[in-house]
């Protein structure tokens, strides 16, 4: 039997998603918890591997099991075995041809900035702090230059292992909600550090250091060295993964659950 789970986690204390020796990873914690409940070794596949410090409210995984358990075992039971900063949001039996990564048609991220002169306290690790005043409207207009299927070489990490730099950004918006500036971006898939590199460049537009047309120039250059610095991991959330409707997966609120602007 193949089961899909919706996963939420706070990435501050993990060295990213992927299982690694001698360091904490989200994958390791989930596989350990699932193996206990299933009473056999479980390996999981995810929709998108997040970097160290990156969070998720809409991660999706799948695993195969021979265990006959009530569905509550895969939600309440797993949550009882997990640390407080990782949680299962839903569970759903899926066809054997479902794959958390390869069946996905889109991923959506939100990047949340606390834009005030002084740093926050309560949400210090849940948002990115940027003290220079930001013009969200200018950032939003600049971001529209990135829409569509394009070569995003200028926004990929040097260590990116993707075979192609082409990605299709379906939607991108930047707006202000009080003290917060929020980037909301959806694409068929993302290159390594792509969202953080886009945000790092949009910040320079937001401060007025660069004109909004500069974003298009970066894209055309196909050169990572001409774009802005990589934005911090704090404040980045994988909030949604889209699948064909016939899989019938639940669609909870996007999150972060404390911030649904």
Swiss-Prot record:
Q: Which superkingdom is the protein from?
A: Bacteria
GO MF annotation: an example: tRNA pseudouridine(38-40) synthase activity
Q: Where is the active site?
A: 51
Q: Which SUPFAM superfamilies match?
A: Pseudouridine synthase
- What does the entry give for GO biological process? tRNA pseudouridine synthesis
- What catalytic reaction does the record list? uridine(38/39/40) in tRNA = pseudouridine(38/39/40) in tRNA
Q: Does Cytoplasm appear among the keywords?
A: no
Q: What is its EC number?
A: 5.4.99.12
- Annotated substrate binding lies at 109
CDD domains this protein is in?
A: PseudoU_synth_EcTruA
Please provide the record's keywords in A-Z order.
Isomerase, tRNA processing
Under the heading Pfam families, the entry gives: PseudoU_synth_1
- The reply on keyword Signal is no
Q: Which family does it belong to?
A: Belongs to the tRNA pseudouridine synthase TruA family.
Q: State the function annotated in the UniProt record.
A: Formation of pseudouridine at positions 38, 39 and 40 in the anticodon stem and loop of transfer RNAs.
Q: How does it assemble?
A: Homodimer.
Which protein is depicted? tRNA pseudouridine synthase A
Where does this protein come from, organism-wise? Tolumonas auensis (strain DSM 9187 / NBRC 110442 / TA 4)
